[in-house]
């Protein structure tokens, strides 16, 4: 078998096949062939390098090259650009031709070597399933691709193609992409990562370059190969019956490597939530990270000690974004009893009921409130001018860090007086919210649910503590709207004065929950909890509240909850 890695060059002012060099340590992790294979060969080609791509490839080959029967290494270290390119990510005709020639060279080598199969894989395609090759080979199909997930609706296959070789929308795409139908399906095109069987007469006629003599479609490597398959009568399939891995959404021609790096970081974060996560290879050195607090005095992460997986995921996400944070052990509602609550001075706000289920306060909600309250106390005690507070179930939107930094810079420039800014929440009446003049990314916050992510000023923390909320407690996400006087229940508001918290919200939002009620992985330590004054230890799953449902008013940046722009080859 011949195993081909198409490693694109990357970094700084690199040209042609460019990917940020931080992709490579992750790409290399699972590129190990099944031990059952008798012989294998690894091949790699890079060009247009001005960063450490070549060094990283050589480092990886030095560690694992002995595992392969043959290693073919081709490197062109001279950096160069194409005369008519608009930017480092612009695919010119010359670039497409160069890529097709390299693919053809790899295909010819595989045939000469007597290989049974050849696997092509782009460096921004991450195979997290180490059984991918075995699963594809067992299908016994001439050309087959593992369906890869991405941050948007983009994937590595087309369900339809026009007679002129352009993309055609079909009714089958979304059910396939979303795995509403599972299996292996015949499609007109696969690209980026796919396996080609070299054991049939039909596939012997396949070629990347030169194009077929009758070829009149667009000059693009993936379309040229799709036409070659069609002309040779070779069926093409995509399989989505397993989670195989991920692919990064491409950037626009005028954008550069920094934007692609940002996209890839977001892909890593999505994989941490949805799984399986991407693991960096031990055989490749990763570029160093320099985490900071983004100009805040502190970044807090509230996390229960008995939820280590959620904590680890959150810290990994922040690390990938180079955000330095401190974990605050959340107060566990399961450890609370009446005597502890009495000692803390905790009492229920008279008349409080959940707005949907009608239940009373739960111990989980008490623990959540006390966790946030302890941070407010620390902010005041240490005189911290501004902080960020995260809960440990945050799904970050694309380019979270830069967007937050830009938002805070704009707030400072406009000299906005603020106490609290929601970064993630569930809006109840978004149509009533007013945009802040001079700050297009900010609105005056209305009644909202959730406290999964927000910024807080010293003045805001002082106002929250001054209201003495422990003596008349309600859930923290109900308390905050009371304090900025936007809660619809006047009886609740009557217990607090003044209600002058200056609260705003990012729009579009920068964060959302990792999961919602009804999702397979959803869990809640506030909804699955005993009533606040019940010491029996019984856990009740409260299903009546709609706060944790996936609501229509999230107002994230994209219709799917993601803010990345569709790729030209995207379904959208």
From Swiss-Prot:
GO BP: cell adhesion
Annotated glycosylation sites: 52, 130, 214, 337
Gene Ontology molecular function: identical protein binding
Sequence motif: Prevents secretion from ER, positions: 569-572
Keywords: Cell adhesion, Endoplasmic reticulum, Glycoprotein
Superkingdom to which the source organism belongs: Eukaryota
Subcellular location(s) per record: Endoplasmic reticulum lumen
InterPro entries: Collagen_mod_GT25, Glyco_trans_25, Nucleotide-diphossugar_trans
CDD domains in UniProt: Glyco_transf_25 (cd06532)
Entries under Pfam families matching the protein: Glyco_transf_25
Presence of the UniProt keyword Endoplasmic reticulum in the record: yes
Any one of the GO CC terms: endoplasmic reticulum lumen
Primary subcellular site in the record, as a coarse category: endoplasmic reticulum
UniProt family annotation: Belongs to the glycosyltransferase 25 family.
Role summary: Probable cell adhesion protein involved in leukocyte transmigration across the blood-brain barrier. Does not express any beta-galactosyltransferase activity in vitro.
Protein name stated in the entry: Probable inactive glycosyltransferase 25 family member 3
Organism per entry: Rattus norvegicus (Rat)
Taxon lineage: Eukaryota, Metazoa, Chordata, Craniata, Vertebrata
Gene: Cercam
């Amino acid at each position: 078998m011949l195993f081909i890695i198409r490693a694109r060059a990357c970094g700084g002012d690199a040209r042609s096949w460019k990917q940020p060099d931080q992709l490579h340590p992750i790409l290399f992790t699972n590129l190990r062939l099944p031990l059952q294979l008798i012989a294998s060969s690894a091949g790699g080609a890079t060009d247009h390098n001005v960063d450490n791509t070549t060094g990283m490839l050589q480092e990886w080959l030095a560690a694992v090259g002995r595992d392969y029967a043959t290693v073919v290494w081709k490197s062109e270290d001279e950096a160069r650009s194409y005369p008519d390119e608009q930017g480092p990510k612009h695919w010119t005709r010359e670039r497409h031709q160069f890529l097709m020639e390299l693919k053809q060279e790899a295909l010819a080598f595989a045939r000469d070597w007597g290989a049974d199969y050849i696997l092509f894989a782009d460096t921004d395609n991450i195979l997290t399933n180490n059984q991918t090759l075995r699963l594809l080979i067992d299908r016994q199909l001439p050309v087959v691709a593992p369906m890869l997930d991405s941050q948007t609706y983009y994937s590595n296959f087309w369900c339809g193609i026009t007679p002129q070789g352009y993309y055609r929308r079909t009714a089958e795409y979304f059910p396939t992409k979303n795995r509403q139908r599972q299996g292996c399906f015949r499609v007109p095109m696969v690209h980026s990562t796919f396996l080609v069987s070299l054991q049939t007469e039909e596939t012997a006629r396949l070629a990347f370059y030169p194009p077929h003599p009758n070829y009149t479609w667009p000059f693009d490597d993936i379309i040229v190969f799709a036409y070659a398959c069609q002309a040779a009568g070779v069926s093409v399939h995509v399989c989505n019956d397993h989670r195989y891995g991920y692919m990064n959404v491409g950037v626009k021609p005028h954008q550069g490597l920094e934007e692609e790096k940002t996209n890839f970081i977001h892909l890593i974060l999505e994989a941490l939530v949805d799984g399986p996560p991407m693991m960096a290879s031990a055989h490749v050195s990763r570029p160093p990270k320099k985490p900071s607090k983004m100009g805040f005095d502190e970044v807090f992460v509230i996390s229960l000690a008995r939820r280590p997986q959620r904590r680890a995921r959150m810290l990994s996400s922040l690390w990938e974004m180079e955000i330095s944070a401190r974990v605050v052990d959340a107060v566990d509602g399961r450890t609370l009893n009446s005597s502890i609550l009495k000692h803390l001075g905790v009492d229920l706000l008279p008349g409080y009921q959940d707005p949907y289920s009608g239940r009373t306060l739960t111990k989980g909600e008490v623990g959540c409130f006390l966790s946030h309250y302890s941070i407010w106390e620390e902010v005041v005690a240490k005189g911290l001018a501004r902080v960020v507070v995260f809960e440990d179930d945050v799904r970050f939107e694309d380019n979270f860090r830069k967007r937050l930094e830009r938002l805070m810079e704009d707030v400072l420039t406009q000299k906005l007086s603020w106490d609290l800014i929601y970064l993630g929440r569930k809006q109840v009446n978004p149509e009533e919210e007013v945009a802040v003049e001079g700050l297009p990314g900010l609105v005056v916050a209305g009644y909202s649910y959730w406290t999964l992510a927000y910024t807080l000023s010293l003045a805001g923390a002082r106002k929250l503590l001054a209201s003495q909320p422990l003596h008349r407690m309600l859930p923290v996400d109900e308390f905050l709207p009371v304090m900025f006087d936007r809660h619809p229940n006047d009886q609740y508001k009557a217990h607090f004065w003044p209600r002058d918290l200056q609260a705003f919200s990012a729009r579009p939002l920068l964060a959302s929950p990792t999961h919602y009620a009804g999702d397979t992985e959803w869990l809640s330590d506030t909804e699955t909890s005993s009533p606040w004054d019940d010491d029996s230890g019984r856990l009740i799953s409260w299903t009546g509240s709609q706060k944790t449902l996936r609501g229509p008013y999230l107002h994230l940046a994209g219709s799917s909850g993601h803010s990345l722009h569709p790729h030209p080859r995207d379904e959208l």
